[in-house]
Amino acid sequence: MNITKSYVVIFFLVMLTNSLSNSDILVSSVIETSKYDVCFIPCTRRYEDRECNDDCLAKDFNDGGCVDGRCCCKY
């Protein structure tokens, strides 16, 4: 019984540690895209910064570019 209890405690400690260690990665993308107003279409090799910027300007935004794999526009 005590061995099972120990395994359960260790399992939960590993899960807690893993969830806390991944939080820094998620926060960095939120901070980077917070400078932009709208993010949409995914950026690819054929749809890069220039195409993204052109689309943003066509939609009456002041600027645009690829951020974290998405086309983001700002006023």
From Swiss-Prot:
Keyword list, A-Z:
Antimicrobial, Disulfide bond, Fungicide, Plant defense, Secreted, Signal
As for subcellular location, the record says: Secreted
Presence of the UniProt keyword Metal-binding in the record? no
Q: Which cysteines are joined by disulfide bonds?
A: 39-73, 43-66, 52-71, 56-72
The main location is secreted
Q: Which GO terms describe its cellular component?
A: extracellular region; plasmodesma
Q: Which InterPro entries match?
A: Defensin-like_dom
Signal sequence residues: 1-19
Q: Which GO terms describe its biological process?
A: defense response to fungus; killing of cells of another organism
Q: Matching Pfam families, A to Z?
A: Defensin (PF24552)
Family label: Belongs to the DEFL family.
Name-wise, this protein is: Defensin-like protein 59
